């Protein structure tokens, strides 16, 4: 079998042809353990996050970072570990989806959740545009579609953070 040609894979991922991009993404996912980490991160940057992120593990692979667990937070009080871990996860998720830090000079979207007897559920994404400071802690996205996707896909992480 011929070695994987990263330049060809890169060209396919940049292709305007959707079937070529889907094929390249399939090849990328199937071979990600064989591709050097820095090349893998570069290739995944070419793919919109909504097309290739289905889990927090995907986020870690695509950012080239190790997946952390509660054990990584053993130095802080036990009751604060889950919140710290989930906050860390959401920070990485927003970093993967935004590709950068969203600034105060642009629209920022944040998923909102509704508390019901059965638990939290995704409600809507809210656009936040202001240079004023508010006491809202949020993990902002640069567009509503990514905010909606993450609010629904990562509701378990948000639920644990919200309590």
Walk through the language-model features, giving the residues of each.
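A short, charged, amphipathic alpha-helix used as a generic interaction element across diverse proteins
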Residues: 142-159
